[in-house]
Amino acid sequence: MGSVNFITHADVLQLIAKRTAEDCIIFLSGPTSRKTPLSLLRMKDVIAVNGSVQYLLNNNVKPFLYLLTDIRFLHRRREDFYNFSRNSQFTIVNLDVYEQASVDDQKYIEENCLIIRSFYRREKGGFLKKIKFNILKRVHKALLISVPLSKRGRLAGFCKDISIGYCSCHTIAYTAIQVAYSLKYGRIICSGLDLTGSCPRFYDESTSPMPSELSKDLFKILPFFTFMRKNVSDLNIFNLSDDTAIHYDIIPYITASELEDEIYYDKIV
C-alpha cells in the first residue's frame, strides 16, 4: 500500500462551502434517535454513522455526511456501506477502515471518500507520549490534549480541525462531534447519544449483528466528554436524548419541539 491521501484543509473548506444549514444533527445509533422528528432531520444537515443511515434513507432523508470508523461494519455489511456512502453527499472513513479494507474497497474509498486519522492508537499516557503531544499541540493550536505522565493513566483530547487529525475514544459520536466542529456549524445537535444500559442500537441488526462494546467502555468514554466541555469554550452543542449517560451539565438537553418552534418562528418572521 502506498502513501495515503488524508483529508486536507482544502477538503474541509469545501465541506463547509457545501453545507446547507447552520445547524447539524449527528444521527447516532441509540434508541432515542427514533424520537427525532423527520421534519427536523430534513431541515438540518445530518451527519449519520454506521447503520443509522438506513432509517434515514427509508424516510427520504439524505445525509449530508456519512461517517464510518469501525472496520467490522465494512467487513460484515459491505453492501450497506456502499449503499449508505453512495446515498450520502459525502463520506468520511478513518485510517483503520482504509488500511484493513480489501484492495477493491480501498480503491472505492480513495476515489469517493475522505480519510481522517487518529492521533494515537491507544489512550494510555506515559512520559514519551506526553513530550510528543506537548510538542504537537504547540505546532497545532487546534489540538487540545492532556497526557498523564503515568502509563497507567489515560489521555483525553479534542481536535478542532480534522485535517490534522482527531482524538478517538471508543465511540464514533465523539469523532462526529469533532467533524461537526471542524465544519463550523453554529450548533451541533446529537440524536441518539444515549450510552445507557447495554447500549443497544435502534436499527435492525438481524443480519450480521455487531456486538456493542460501549457499556464496558463507558468509563473510558466519559472523561473525553468532560474534557471537551472544560476545554472547548466555543462549542455550541446539545443533546436530544432524554435517556443518556452524558450529564446535561456536559451536553445540555434540548427538545425537538424547541427546535421545531425555532423553524416555525423563522418562517413567519
Swiss-Prot record:
GO terms for cellular component: cytoplasm. Its main location: cytoplasm. It is found in: Cytoplasm. Pathway: Bacterial outer membrane biogenesis; LPS core biosynthesis. It is an enzyme of class 2 (transferase). It catalyses: an alpha-Kdo-(2->4)-alpha-Kdo-(2->6)-lipid IVA + CMP-3-deoxy-beta-D-manno-octulosonate = an alpha-Kdo-(2->4)-alpha-Kdo-(2->4)-alpha-Kdo-(2->6)-lipid IVA + CMP + H(+). One of its GO terms (biological process) is lipopolysaccharide core region biosynthetic process. This is Probable 3-deoxy-manno-octulosonic acid transferase. It comes from Salmonella typhimurium (strain LT2 / SGSC1412 / ATCC 700720). The lineage of its organism: Bacteria, Pseudomonadati, Pseudomonadota, Gammaproteobacteria, Enterobacterales.
